C-alpha cells in the first residue's frame, strides 16, 4: 500500500517504514546465509570458501544492478511526493527499459569474464572450480535479480515497504527448501545453491508484477503510459548510473581485500566468509534506516518540504547510532558461538580469526551508521556526486588495508579495511550534507 511521507511525524514515519524494511533485509540476508550455512555444513569448509570467495565479485556485478535500480526509483519517489502521478508512470516505464538494457549487458560481460576475474583475484586452486560453477549460475540469473530489486525499490519509493517483504519471506522459505533439496538430496554441490537463489528471485519478481497489476493503479501501465523521452531517460540515468558505479567502486575495494585474503589461504577465506555473513546481518538496522531516508528525503524534496528532511535526519541518527552501539557490543561478546554455527566444531583457528574480525569491525559500526544516513539522504535529493566520491574514498581505504596492512599484520590487517573505508567515506558525506542544507536554508539551492 502506497504511503505519503510528506505529512505526519517524521520519527513515526521513519520507524514504521524501517521495521518492514529491516525484516525484509533480514530475510534477504537469510537468502544469502542459507547458501553459506548449508554449503558449509553439508559439503564442507572447502566449498564454503569457494562460495565465500565469490562474494566480492557478486557484489561488483549484482551491486551495480542493485545500485542502478535504487537510483531509478528516486525520480519516481520525487514525482510521487509532488503528486505527479502521470510522471510516476512515465518514470516506471523508463526504469524498466533501462533495467532491461543493463541486464543484457551485465549478463553477457559477467559470464564471459568471471573465470578470468577469479584468476586475477588469485583464487586458491582448491576452490576456483567451485567458485566458477557458482558464479555462472548466479550471473545467468541477473535478469531475475534485477527485476526483483527494481520492483521492490519502486514499491518503497511510493512508501510501501510491506508488500516486497511478504514476497521476500515466501521466497526465502523457498530458497532454503530448494537449498536443502538441491544440495543435500540431489547432491548438486555449490551449483545447487546458485539455482536455489535464482529460482527464488524469479518467484519474487513474478509475484511483484502480479501484485502491481492487481492492486496498485498508480503503477499499472497502459499503452498511453509507454512514453520515454530523451529528457526523462537522461534524468534517470543521471541519478541511477552514479549510484550503480558507486556500488561497483566499493565492490572493487572488497575485491582487493579478497585478493589479500586469498593469499593468506583457505582458513582466512573461510573465517572471513563466515564473519562477513554475520556482519552483513548485523549492519542491517543501520542500512535499513539509511534506505528509509532515501525514500523519505526524495518524497519531501519533491514536495519542497525541506525542514522535514533536516528533522528526519536528526531523528534517524539517534535511532541508528543506538542500534550500532548495541549490535557492536553483542557481536564482540558472542562472535565465537556464531562463527561455530557456520563451520562446526574442530575449526578453532577459523573461530579465532572470526573473533578478531568483530573486534575491529563491531566497535566501529557508528561510522557506518552515519555513513548510511548521509549517503542515502543525499541520493534521495538527487545529489550523486559526493556519494560517488565517498565510494572512491572507500576504494582507496580498502586498497591500503589490502596491499599494505595485510602484508604487515596478516588477517587483522585485512579486517581493518571496513572501519577505514567507513570513516573515509563518512567524512565527505557529512560535509556535503551540511553544505547542501546550508544552501537550501539560504535560498541558494532549491
Q: Predicted regions: what is each one?
A:
Residues 27, 31, 61, 65, ...:
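Residue-level hotspots within pore-lining transmembrane alpha-helices
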Residues 1-18, 76-141, 185-241, 297-364, ...:
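Short alpha-helical transmembrane segments in multi-pass integral membrane proteins
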Residues 48-108, 145-164, 272-335, 368-390:
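Small-residue-rich hydrophobic transmembrane alpha-helices
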Amino acid at each position: 500500500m502506497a504511503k505519503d511521507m510528506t505529512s505526519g511525524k517524521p520519527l513515526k514515519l521513519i520507524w514504521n517504514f524501517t521495521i518492514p524494511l529491516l525484516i525484509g533485509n533480514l530475510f534477504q540476508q537469510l537468502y544469502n546465509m542459507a547458501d553459506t550455512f548449508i554449503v558449509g555444513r553439508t559439503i564442507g569448509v572447502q566449498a564454503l570458501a569457494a562460495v565465500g570467495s565469490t562474494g566480492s565479485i557478486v557484489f561488483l556485478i549484482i551491486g551495480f544492478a542493485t545500485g542502478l535500480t535504487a537510483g531509478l526509483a528516486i525520480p519516481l519517489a520525487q514525482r510521487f511526493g509532488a503528486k505527479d502521478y502521470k510522471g510516476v508512470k512515465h518514470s516506471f516505464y523508463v526504469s524498466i527499459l533501462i533495467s532491461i538494457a543493463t541486464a543484457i549487458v551485465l549478463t553477457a560481460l559477467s559470464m564471459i569474464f568471471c573465470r578470468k576475474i577469479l584468476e586475477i583475484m588469485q583464487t586458491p586452486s582448491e576452490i576456483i572450480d567451485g567458485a566458477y560453477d557458482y558464479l555462472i549460475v548466479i550471473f545467468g540469473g541477473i535478469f531475475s535479480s534485477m527485476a526483483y530489486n527494481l520492483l521492490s525499490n519502486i514499491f518503497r519509493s511510493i512508501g510501501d515497504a510491506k508488500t516486497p517483504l511478504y514476497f521476500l519471506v515466501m521466497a526465502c522459505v523457498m530458497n532454503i527448501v530448494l537449498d536443502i533439496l538441491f544440495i543435500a538430496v540431489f547432491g548438486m554441490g555449490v551449483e545447487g545453491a546458485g539455482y536455489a537463489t535464482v529460482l527464488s528471485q524469479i518467484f519474487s519478481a513474478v509475484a511483484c508484477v502480479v501484485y502491481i497489476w492487481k492492486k496498485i493503479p498508480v503503477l499499472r501501465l497502459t499503452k498511453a503510459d509507454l512514453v520515454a523521452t530523451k529528457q526523462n531517460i537522461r534524468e534517470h540515468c543521471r541519478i541511477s548510473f552514479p549510484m550503480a558505479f558507486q556500488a561497483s567502486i566499493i565492490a572493487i575495494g572488497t575485491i582487493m581485500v579478497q585478493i589479500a585474503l586469498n593469499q593468506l589461504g583457505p582458513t582466512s577465506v573461510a573465517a572471513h566468509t563466515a564473519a562477513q555473513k554475520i556482519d552483513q546481518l548485523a549492519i542491517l538496522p543501520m542500512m535499513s534506516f539509511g534506505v528509509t531516508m532515501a525514500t523519505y528525503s526524495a518524497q519531501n524534496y519533491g514536495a519542497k518540504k525541506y525542514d522535514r528532511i533536516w528533522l528526519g535526519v536528526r531523528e534517524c541518527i539517534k535511532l541508528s547510532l543506538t542500534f550500532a552501539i548495541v549490535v557492536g557490543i553483542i557481536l564482540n561478546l558472542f562472535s565465537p558461538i556464531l562463527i561455530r554455527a557456520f563451520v562446526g566444531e574442530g575449526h578453532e583457528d577459523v573461530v579465532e580469526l572470526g573473533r578478531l574480525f568483530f573486534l575491529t569491525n563491531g566497535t566501529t559500526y557508528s561510522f557506518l551508521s552515519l555513513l548510511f544516513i548521509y549517503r542515502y539522504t543525499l541520493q534521495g535529493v538527487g545529489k550523486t556526486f559526493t556519494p560517488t566520491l565517498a565510494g572512491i574514498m572507500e576504494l582507496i581505504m580498502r586498497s591500503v588495508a589490502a596491499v599494505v596492512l595485510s602484508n604487515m599484520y596478516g588477517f587483522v590487517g585485512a579486517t581493518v579495511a571496513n572501519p577505514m573505508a567507513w570513516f573515509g567515506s563518512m567524512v565527505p558525506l557529512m560535509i556535503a550534507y551540511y553544505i547542501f542544507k546550508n544552501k537550501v536554508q539560504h535560498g541558494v539551492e532549491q
